[in-house]
Amino acid sequence: DVLFARTMHGVFKNIEFMCTRKDSKTWGKDAWKKIVVCVVSDGRAKINPRTRAVLAGLGVYQDGIAKQQVNGKDVTAHIYEYTTQVGISLKKDIVTLTPKQQPVQLLFCLKEKNQKKINSHRWFFQAFGRVLDPNICVLLDAGTKPGKDSIYHLWKAFDLEPHCAGACGEIKAMLGPGGKNLVNPLVAT
């Protein structure tokens, strides 16, 4: 839940930033209407119960309604959709849901079986991509926290160069206050 919340908090901050771009032809106060946050979870039995609780708190998941079969046929995935006005804050690895002004459109795909990351990417592009027909897509793993305007800058790279097929951002280690995370060998390397 902490990794998921860290990522979603960063995504929400980026949407808020795009909504403050008053002089933009593309963005501005209704920018949130042009952005859909898609979350794909790999396996109903595998999803962390606390992450499920965060999704339920955001309004995009309902516990107990997913079924393995419908009319005798196996279910592949469960799709939930909601426009939330609930925010996420994270302090000392404690996730808190907070009221927020900026709406965020959410699509949540809970795959019935764990079929690994590439299958999740396929779901994202083949299922949601065909329906949403986005100008750009940004893929983030849970735990990756985008800076408050980094998604905007990725979008800007595509906007300035329409023939650009891909771009990536810079990844920085989260050092923590006073660099305390550097004591952790996983962060320090």
Swiss-Prot record:
GO molecular function terms listed in the Swiss-Prot or TrEMBL record: chitin synthase activity
UniProt protein name: Chitin synthase 1
Function: Polymerizes chitin, a structural polymer of the cell wall and septum, by transferring the sugar moiety of UDP-GlcNAc to the non-reducing end of the growing chitin polymer.
BP-aspect Gene Ontology terms: cell wall organization; chitin biosynthetic process
EC number: 2.4.1.16
Lineage, top ranks: Eukaryota, Fungi, Dikarya, Ascomycota, Pezizomycotina
Catalytic activity: [(1->4)-N-acetyl-beta-D-glucosaminyl](n) + UDP-N-acetyl-alpha-D-glucosamine = [(1->4)-N-acetyl-beta-D-glucosaminyl](n+1) + UDP + H(+)
Gene label: chs1
Subcellular compartments: Cell membrane
Entry keyword Lyase: no
Membrane protein topology class: Multi-pass membrane protein
Family: Belongs to the chitin synthase family. Class I subfamily.
Keywords: Cell membrane, Cell wall biogenesis/degradation, Glycosyltransferase, Membrane, Transferase, Transmembrane
Gene Ontology CC terms, in alphabetical order: cell septum; plasma membrane
Primary residence: membrane
Lyase in keyword set: no
Broad EC category: transferase
